[in-house]
Swiss-Prot record:
Gene: pkiA
Pathway connected to this protein: Carbohydrate degradation; glycolysis; pyruvate from D-glyceraldehyde 3-phosphate: step 5/5
Catalytic activity: pyruvate + ATP = phosphoenolpyruvate + ADP + H(+)
Residues that hold K(+) according to the record: 65, 67, 99-100
Protein name as catalogued: Pyruvate kinase
Enzyme superclass (EC): transferase
PROSITE patterns assigned: PYRUVATE_KINASE
Record-listed Mg(2+) binding positions: 256, 280
Self-association state and partner proteins as the record states: Homotetramer.
Species per Swiss-Prot/TrEMBL record: Agaricus bisporus
Length: 532
């Protein structure tokens, strides 16, 4: 791999970093960011105008949180997002993600809706007996997981309300668990329950989740963020529910419990991508260990070339404040340095007072973090862990990234049908943009999951005769260059590496071309395919 200014180590590269020379996003550079931004859409920004604002600030994927809201509300998010996309002059795609509620465990309803204080040392009963489901107090607390008594044991812990209350199990008698409070707190209605170091046997989808997935299929969502995944079989069950009509929807698994971390390898084999969901994960395992789990999962995703998202509390203070804490900015930057493909905003955009500012801050931080990466040793590391021999498409992707470095090319341009070639090029983390052109509109949206990819949907019909093939290829290249120029991703006269197939369809990528971006706009006009 050709060195960056003669530097071939990350530590040496770090010595050259200069805050005075750090790039600041402007109208001409804001699209240079490689890391995608996911924003959760709440009522505050669920209008075409406000969605346009956050998109212009840097959002690539919108997230619908199905733990809240009705189908009618989420339909409005989909409709407003699609209208916003239509209004964009460059037609740049924005993906839509459905985040499932998942198989949560919760306490019951308190008696008369009251809150009940408890003190450290208090002892009471946690029960799965449904007759207590709506009369909970500080003597008997119902939990809606029927198998609780059979999967846990004395000496284990139960966490209530995001870990605010810790309960130690003293003994078990049928459906009743005798527990002791380890700290002061307040018992309220319908609070979340976590069971650390316990193998929970809940199904991956509730009936509500299945209904939500059917809603997503009808509306053509691009990806599912599947909550509380614990084992590889969970992913297979979700695929069965999606069925043929939802086969093209990407399944991004959320790892947010100890089981998911322990079974990560088998889950990764089944999933299309991973979200490091640090909220619940930081309850189930010690908070001090979350960063280790994050680094492990990101590394394993990078090695196999599957997208990975880092989420939860990234700029949490910007929900209410116009500026983030320094620690939050470092958290976003370190997620990028770790190798994440996407970073996510939750309450910051869903209910926050500063949604646009939150996106702008995340976009600027990602852009700066990307400049702190020394790409040659990163490429070498990724090559070193890749088993040989490689498949043809991956061999071409490796060669394209290496050729771009040797040529000092300013972009790679990938023609892709399914997005697989773009994924493979992204896997080797080139320092330059990956302009991706595809005829599949959903593929164009899904490609945002992969770092460095700038997707464009090519709407023109395919040339079906052999003599039309090269003209069709050249037209798609011109289309990609024209759109990339419009967004200042590349400049006229720049050298680029084009990656294409030798014929149409899937699985035929085997060709590299070294091209120069035309300086005359007329050279980017699409050519007629001729008579069929």
């Amino acid at each position: 791999m050709y060195p960056v200014d003669g530097i071939r180590s990350q530590i040496e590269w770090n010595t050259t970093l200069n805050v005075s020379d750090a790039p600041v996003p402007t109208e001409t550079t804001k699209y240079h960011r490689k890391t995608a931004i996911i924003a959760t859409i709440g009522p505050k920004i669920n209008t075409v105008e406000k969605l346009t604002d956050v998109r212009l600030a840097g959002v690539n994927i919108v997230r619908m949180n199905f733990s809240h809201g009705t189908h009618e509300y989420h339909q409005s998010v989909i409709d407003n997002t699609r209208q916003m996309i239509k209004n964009d002059p460059h037609g740049r795609p924005v993906a839509i993600a459905l985040d499932t509620k998942g198989p949560e465990i919760r306490t019951g309803q308190t008696r008369d809706g009251n809150d009940y204080p408890i003190k450290a040392g208090d002892e009471f009963i946690v029960t799965t007996d449904p007759k207590y489901s709506d009369i909970c107090d500080n003597k008997v607390l119902f939990v809606d997981y029927a198998n609780l008594a059979s999967v846990t044991a004395p000496g284990k812990l139960i966490y209530i309300d995001d870990g605010i209350i810790s309960l130690l199990i003293l003994s078990i008698d049928g459906m009743n668990l005798h527990v002791r409070a380890l700290n002061n707190g307040t018992l309220s209605s319908r609070k979340g329950v976590n069971l650390p170091k316990t193998d929970v046997d809940l199904p991956p989808l509730s009936e509500k989740d299945k209904d939500d997935l059917r809603f997503g299929i009808r509306n053509g969502v691009d990806m599912i963020f599947a909550s509380f995944i614990r084992r590889g079989e969970d992913v297979r069950q979700i695929r069965e529910v999606l069925g043929p009509d939802g086969a093209s929807i990407k399944i991004i698994v959320k790892i947010e419990n100890e089981q998911g971390v322990a079974n990560f390898d088998e889950i990764l084999k089944e999933a299309d991508g991973v979200m490091v969901a640090r909220g619940d994960l930081g309850i189930e395992i010690p908070a001090s260990q979350v960063f280790l789990a994050q680094k492990m999962m990101i590394a394993k995703c990078n090695i196999v070339g599957k997208p990975v998202i880092v989420a939860t509390q990234m700029l949490e203070s910007m929900t209410y404040n116009p500026r983030p804490t320094r620690a939050e900015v470092s958290d976003v930057a370190n997620a990028v340095l770790d190798g994440s493909d996407c970073v996510m905003l939750s309450g910051e955009t869903a209910k926050g007072s500063y949604p646009v500012q939150s996106v702008l801050m995340m976009a600027e931080t990602c852009l700066l973090a990307e400049t702190a990466i020394c790409y040659p040793p990163l490429y070498d590391d990724l090559r070193a862990v890749q088993a040989r021999p490689t498949e043809t498409a991956e061999t071409v992707a490796i060669a394209a990234v290496a050729a771009a470095a040797e040529q000092d090319a300013k972009a790679l341009l990938v023609l892709s049908t399914s997005g697989e070639t773009a994924r493979l090029v992204s896997k080797y983390r080139p320092k330059i943009p990956i302009i991706t052109v595809t005829r599949n509109e959903q593929t164009a949206r899904q490609i945002h999951l992969h770092r460095g990819c700038y997707p464009f949907w090519y709407p023109e019909p395919r040339g079906v005769q052999n003599h039309q093939w090269q003209t069709d290829v050249d037209n798609r290249i011109r289309f990609g260059l024209r759109n990339a120029l419009a967004l200042n991703v590349i400049q006229p006269g720049a050298s680029i590496i084009a990656v294409q197939g030798w014929k149409g369809g899937l699985g035929h990528t085997n060709t590299l071309r070294i091209l120069t971006v035309p300086t005359d706009p007329a050279d980017l006009e699409l050519q007629p395919l001729g008579s069929l």
